[in-house]
Amino acid sequence: MTIRYPNGRPFQPAKASSTHKREKIDYSNRGMTLESDINETNSYYLTHGRAVIHKKPTPVQIVNVDYPKRSAAVIKEAYFKQPSTTDYNGVYRGKYLDFEAKETRNKTSFPIQNFHEHQMEHMKKVLAQDGICFVIVRFTTFDETYLLDASHVIKAFETKETKRKSIPKSYIDSYGHLIKIGYHPRVDYLHVVDQVYFS
């Protein structure tokens, strides 16, 4: 017996699909969750008069632009003018503050390859001028965010050829400082900065 719809067409059951489509993994926004949390936190700090900290823009030289419409421009070719230093800088309690923010899905360590030579040189110069310099590291698997002084990262970077190519999570647990995640501010890293650099 054929089952029919009210319009007379026969019912056709949906075919069971045996092929499972894998979702494409998008790596384009790695680090953007931490970055957006820090941007939101910095906005909170600025609004409440706690600190003036901003994300540094990456210097880009635009070479080729296409104008498909009058109101829209599409950048077709661009180059970095110079290597960028760290992600954020500003002033807090009369001291210069400079830091990098990085995220990893790795469960046991933080890869040193996420840093570049010019960033290490910049961090050394900030520390030499008695500035506050650190790295905020988020282990996304554990939803844990740490503040780690730049001196530890520089030391690990300088020994990466002879020793490890990563900083073990156990090292970050010992020498880093866990940052409490909340609502406002989202990533209250200044609370940790107070404890580490002003106590």
Swiss-Prot record:
GO terms for molecular function: endonuclease activity; magnesium ion binding; nucleic acid binding. GO terms for cellular component: cytoplasm. It comes from the Bacteria. Its EC number is 3.1.21.10. Keywords: Cytoplasm, DNA damage, DNA recombination, DNA repair, Endonuclease, Hydrolase, Magnesium, Metal-binding, Nuclease. Its cofactor is Mg(2+). Binds 1 Mg(2+) ion per subunit. Pfam families: RecU. Its main location: cytoplasm. It catalyses: Endonucleolytic cleavage at a junction such as a reciprocal single-stranded crossover between two homologous DNA duplexes (Holliday junction). Mg(2+) binds at residues 85, 87, 100, 119. InterPro entries: Resolv_RecU, Restrct_endonuc-II-like, tRNA_endonuc-like_dom_sf. It is found in: Cytoplasm. The keyword Nuclease applies. The record marks 102 as: Transition state stabilizer. Residues 1-24 are annotated as: Disordered. Belongs to the RecU family. Endonuclease that resolves Holliday junction intermediates in genetic recombination. Cleaves mobile four-strand junctions by introducing symmetrical nicks in paired strands. Promotes annealing of linear ssDNA with homologous dsDNA. Required for DNA repair, homologous recombination and chromosome segregation. This is Holliday junction resolvase RecU. The gene is recU.
